[in-house]
Amino acid sequence: MDVVQQKQDKQLQHQTQEQQQIREDQQEVPPQRPRQQNRWKPWWNSTADDEPNTGRIAEYPNGQGRSSPTTDFQDSVNSNNDNKGIWSKIASFATSRYRSAPIVVDDNTRYSQLNTEQINFLENEAKDIISKKSKSWCWYEAIPHISNSSNIIDSIDTPGIISVSGTGSAKCPLPLNKYPGEGGNPGYNVFINDSLILPSDNPLNFLHVQPLRTKVLNTIKNYYNFPNEQHLYLRQKKTALLKDKRIIIISVVGDLPEKYEQRSLESQRSAYYLSRKLSQNLAQEQPQRVLTLSFQCPLHNQDLIPTYKECVELLNHWAHLFKEVDSIFFVGVYHSVPLTLLLAKYIVQNNEVLEFDENTTVSVLSFQSCLQGYRFWDHSTDFTSNSYNNLGSNSSTNENDSNDHDSNNDFTTKSQQIKEKQLFQGIDKKQQDTLSKIKNYRRIDSSESKLVQDALDWLLFNWDTFRLTFFGKLYDNFMTISEKLAIDYNHPKILRNLWCNGKYMGIDLKNANNLNLDTDDEATSNINDVHVRTPNFESRLKIPTNRLFEITLWDILMITENLGYKQFIPIINLLSPFFISRSFNDYTLPPNIRKQYQNSNKIWLQEMDSKWKMNGHQLNYDQREGESLGSSSESLLPENISTVKDFLQFVQYQNEKSSDFVRIYSDIYDDDKVYKCFLYNTIFTKNPLSRKHLRLNIDLDTPTSILNTVNQYDLVWKIHDSFSKLIQLKNLPQREIPHALRLSISLNCFLDSTTSTSGPVFQRDTVEALRRLTEIWRTYQDWSPPTRGLKHLRDILSVLAMYDNPKNLINDVRRT
């Protein structure tokens, strides 16, 4: 028995030693990251007391914590998200790699309660999730006053507060010294814009104040349920509308795989950048304060609803910011626009809890929206010749018209599948499944589309001050104008603008000798004679004569669209596909054009090498670090660079040689006029007299192919019919037809070139409509576009060349 007892004692002692060793090993070895992440739960039940003690970074009304109504706001979050039960009663834990005791992060956790090790762990955890792009996260920042930072777009060192879904910072937001995401350039940020906005960068140029007679008529029409107020009217007061106002900017951007982004949008900016850019333009209006919430969301591998819930969870921490706010501005890009509208509806629905009233302005800026989905277009020679030859051989035995029609449908479906496969090349299956749902917005009866329709309809009908501004590119390789501007969504409070890039209108800023400034002084008509002392310059650049037709045509179409003349929607749908080309994206250039561009660029670089290296004009980081942040940086210019031509060449040469040091911004997201236009569309327009619901058009006009003969005949008849409707329009704004782009060069800072104008003249006759048709005929005679689609459109519209003068054209369309 003694022997047996001794063996049992030894076994017990051995087991005790092993358990002790395991505990010691667990204390010494830090936990693995994946296991750590799995311990976090999706929390939806934040309380009103959940606020970090962040010192000077966080702003609270009257210097106090959140107000009591916020508790109701949290309760509404819980009920809306259907997350009740045991999860609301369990705290969230994270095991520190520095401590054996766990970090408890729950609704009652204060930032001031955390020690250095815990803070470091939570910060590293948040940054790790951000780098993986697997969860939604929000960056809060109080924008400094314009007098303290004139060039705020160049500063990423402004402190803010980070909150990442699925981490401890989702419960206890963390103050950081600088923005944790991608962005920021240690060198120079040079903004070069040669662009034009249609119909105008200011609604004052195509809208007017509602006359008393019109107001009475609209009231009577509304009483009898007749159509009325087809468009917005201007306010009487148009000055200091944002001065001393409290403003919140909410930017929402969805991540995209790099290759997908390049093939579709060419590029997009971060939510942080969009918030900064809009706040920079707001600074000119002298608001009392500007607060920003920048949401970066994993919409590339996560569906809309889960992402929406994550954003709502993060919004709970900032409920106190909305108290007595005067304006809330939203910004969304492409597939984040639906999420932006859902968040806007959620915030507005809770306005009483958030303590802002119905007078608060709510407005959404949409870049390249996906609300109308997309389909693929390709007008390249190799695609059309090979595919249609194969189609002809396969259907040659089928003489029946219905069989031919089926073959065309089969070809269209197959071609769409081929292009979609190219778009999704290089991304995983989950991302493909998620991103492929974007095209479902094309069907107005799809679940994706209905969800957005309901949110947008609620905002348009229930919130008088709500505005929606769609911005899209005229020249694109992916989506048509109708798709980007959601042309089938009709409501007076929806405004649409087109952004035209001079790069795709035959204007080459590298070869500045061919530029033609639009000045009244003949002495400065040559760009070599325009001298600059600083890297800030603004002028107008003449549009080449052989491309004026495109601008003239779309200018009047955008005017009619924003004035509520929906009878022109069919022709917009028919014309839009012709402005699609692979050449309108640097990442989708056809091989022959890419090779041609590379050869010409190589020659240009050799010329610039000999020009600038010989003279010793080189930039370095030491020089940049020696300058004050946000300065105009005159040292960017070598001493003997004194003209616009030399500056353009020098900056673009430096950008080619060291793009990480000299970075050029020239896309739609970088144009200050876009943001000013959005603000003017919002604050200068008057609320309609009566509420209206969103109306949807059923698109039966967009062709399946621009090369289809039936569609070509249809376009000829539709354009003729549109001309006959155009010359009947009365009270069109009498203003100059655009013939010049805005050329702007700046180093981070905003060039405020706003000039006070008397606005256009409105007369109740057809004089302006006739003048517009005359200009369409005149500019067509010189039209010589470069791309296959536009050349094809020119051939289809060759009927315009049959008329000897515009009077004959006018007389002809009058007879129809």
UniProtKB/Swiss-Prot annotation:
Region (Disordered): 1-81, 391-411
Record's compositionally biased regions (Low complexity): 28-44, 391-400
Modified sites of kind Phosphoserine: 76, 79
Biased composition (Polar residues): 64-81
Any one of the GO CC terms: vacuole-mitochondrion membrane contact site
UniProt keyword list: Phosphoprotein
GO biological process, one term: sphingolipid metabolic process
Other comments on record: Present with 279 molecules/cell in log phase SD medium.
Protein name: Uncharacterized protein YMR160W
